[in-house]
């Protein structure tokens, strides 16, 4: 799926699953409306709210030159009650 890179599983994101909120990293150039459309179309759910913040890239030294990795955007997607994204809450082995 274009735009969504991968799901995030941190302590906070696991806690947010109880409130029907899912966390994922997306491409930094994607807009909220694009991500909302992709999630509703791909997973067949109804999105009621989206929060996002941009995370900074990490610094990388290449000899005397200091570079950095690309920054990315993290989205917290809230679904309507009764909807869930089953592929994200299954236990991975």
From Swiss-Prot:
GO CC annotations, alphabetized: chloroplast; ribonucleoprotein complex; ribosome
Function: Binds to 23S rRNA.
GO biological process: translation
GO molecular function, one term: rRNA binding
Assigned protein family: Belongs to the universal ribosomal protein uL23 family.
UniProt lineage: Eukaryota, Viridiplantae, Streptophyta, Embryophyta, Tracheophyta
Source superkingdom: Eukaryota
Organism this protein belongs to: Liriodendron tulipifera (Tuliptree)
Alphabetic keyword roster: Chloroplast, Plastid, Ribonucleoprotein, Ribosomal protein, RNA-binding, rRNA-binding
Subcellular location: Plastid, Chloroplast
Protein's name according to its UniProt entry: Large ribosomal subunit protein uL23cz/uL23cy
Subunit structure: Part of the 50S ribosomal subunit.
